[in-house]
């Protein structure tokens, strides 16, 4: 048997509600209303925190995938630009070769390569 003492005075105090005072608009006969928030209290804070973490993880993954896709696109574009530049240079040398002697053309190529290295 337990030896708990129950005070009879505590129960009636909690049952008595505190008066709210006079209403601002003067309609004391109306029952006080609370804000209508049907969604509040349906999900716990832990649940909301979990969903936020999950959404953040998904967003990070999506961002990573987008960055990878963009990097791949830039790499392909750069390869295409380099390929076009090489093709244009080759055509230019072919036109020069039609006009110049072979040895002179080789010297010109070497000279241009030295200038490229110096300028870059």
Swiss-Prot record:
Compositional bias (Basic residues): 24-36
Secretion signal, residue range per the UniProt entry: none
Pfam families xref list: Cgr1
KW Nucleotidyltransferase (keyword) present: no
Coiled coil regions in record: 54-114
Top-rank lineage group of the source organism: Eukaryota
GO process annotations (BP): rRNA processing
GO cellular component terms given for this protein: nucleolus
Localization in the cell: Nucleus, Nucleolus
Keywords of this entry: Coiled coil, Nucleus, Ribosome biogenesis, rRNA processing
Location of region: Disordered: 1-47
Function: Involved in nucleolar integrity and required for processing of the pre-rRNA for the 60S ribosome subunit.
Family recorded in the similarity comment: Belongs to the CGR1 family.
Name under which the protein is recorded: rRNA-processing protein CGR1
Species name: Chaetomium globosum (strain ATCC 6205 / CBS 148.51 / DSM 1962 / NBRC 6347 / NRRL 1970)
Gene: CGR1
């Amino acid at each position: 048997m337990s030896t708990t003492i129950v005070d009879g005075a505590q129960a009636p105090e909690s049952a008595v509600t505190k008066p709210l005072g006079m209403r601002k608009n003067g309609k004391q006969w109306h029952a006080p209303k609370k804000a209508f928030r049907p969604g509040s209290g349906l999900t716990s804070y832990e649940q909301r925190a979990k969903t936020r973490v999950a959404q953040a993880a998904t967003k990070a993954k999506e961002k990573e995938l987008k960055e990878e896709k963009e990097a791949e696109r830039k790499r392909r574009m750069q390869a295409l630009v380099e390929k076009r530049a090489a093709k244009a240079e080759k055509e230019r040398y072919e036109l020069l070769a039609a006009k110049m002697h072979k040895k002179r053309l080789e010297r010109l190529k070497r000279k241009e390569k030295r200038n490229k290295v110096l300028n870059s």
